[in-house]
Regions:
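Short alpha-helix within the catalytic core of nucleotide-sugar-dependent glycosyltransferases
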Residues: 72-75, 120, 135-146, 198
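Hydrophobic targeting segments
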Residues: 28-31, 48, 58-61
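Short internal beta-strands
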Residues: 57-65, 153-155
């Protein structure tokens, strides 16, 4: 039995449908975000639509906040691409008691709400983190067929050494054969609910023994619960890259012509004005082809962002801007 009942969780729903009749061959794509990712999510959707005009997609955005301006932009986006976008405003009270960190808030648990919400509504959902940009076709995901007992198609994170670390820390030896990043989940909704994954995950996240082991919150938990019931697919669907890698002298950029989704991991996102690098181009192209086209990229608003902004400005040889942001950083830290 799910701990996340629709009537308790969904407060409001806004539907922006400019494709009058939903195609039978439609890929449902879902995002779970807080207010800090609304801008990024909108452009992520635009990037998918821009690169997949021949595919019917319906988008589902689960958030705990949305303004009238945001609703207008999402409506305009659906109209611009003759698409369907649904916004669900959710009650997060049941999630706020779960573990969180500086980098991962309770919003990371929205994927549990998503997987439960679509039970008996859709057979398959593509869950994506909002800090992605699409630069290729997702038709293979639309056509994807799950095998027997398969709960999700996933993409491996990092390398064998990392998998072995997770297997040891999480006392789950089978993870040595593969550990996935939860920012991309092609979910078999029936199997997910048959195995009661969301409820089991929440129970684990309330268990002191498990809390002492996990470092990657729901990602660790999902790897344990879905162990042996996932299929690892091509890394082109979740090509992870931190824009902060650009601060290094030598950068190994995994993004190439085959990449479908760039996943901008780490604290610096392509919607930050200090993220001025070629790897941000896919995001910026989509932004220019969306209702957010005239919106400024975001400036730093806290000490951590001022620090990274300063570092990137020096890397980009914008020295005065670098000095200014370091001064702002020290002011935030000291006062």
């Amino acid at each position: 039995m799910s701990q996340l009942n629709d009537s308790d969780i969904i407060l409001f729903e806004y539907n922006f449908h400019y494709q009058n009749i939903r195609s039978k061959n439609t890929l449902d794509i879902a995002f779970g975000i807080d207010r800090n990712f609304l801008f990024g999510c909108g452009v992520a959707i635009a990037s998918i639509l821009l690169n997949n005009r021949e595919i019917s997609c319906e988008f589902h955005v689960f958030t705990d906040y949305i303004s009238d301006k945001d609703k207008l932009y999402f409506s305009d986006l659906a109209k611009q691409y003759n698409s369907r976008i649904n916004i669900y405003v959710i009650n997060c009270d049941k999630l706020k008691s779960l573990p969180s960190t500086k980098n991962w808030t309770y919003a990371t648990y929205f994927r549990f709400i998503i997987a439960d919400y679509f039970y008996n509504k859709h057979e398959k959902i593509l869950y994506l983190d909002a800090d992605i940009a699409c630069k290729g076709s997702i038709k293979e995901l639309l056509d994807y067929q799950f095998s027997t007992n398969e709960i999700a198609a996933v993409v491996a994170e990092r390398d064998v050494e990392w998998w072995q670390n997770r297997a040891s820390v999480l006392t789950t030896p089978q993870l040595a054969s593969g550990y996935f990043n939860a920012g991309f989940l092609l979910i078999n909704i029936d199997e997910w609910n048959l195995n009661n994954i969301s409820s089991k995950a929440i129970e684990m996240l309330r268990d002191p023994d498990w809390i002492s082991k996990i470092t990657h919150l729901d990602q660790d938990v999902l790897n344990v619960l879905l162990n042996g019931k996932v299929k690892f697919i091509s890394g082109k669907y979740n090509t992870r890259y931190s824009i902060n890698y650009e601060l290094k002298d030598k950068v190994d950029n995994p993004v190439n012509d085959d990449t479908v989704f760039i996943h901008y991991v780490g604290p610096t996102k392509p919607w930050h004005e200090w993220a001025d690098y070629p790897v941000s181009r896919s995001f910026l192209i989509a932004k220019a082809s969306s209702p957010w086209c005239k919106e400024d990229l975001l400036k730093p608003v806290n000490s951590n962002q001022y620090r990274y902004c300063a570092k990137h400005k020096f890397k980009q040889k914008h020295y005065m801007a670098g000095i200014f942001n370091y001064l702002k950083y020290y002011k935030e830290k000291c006062f």
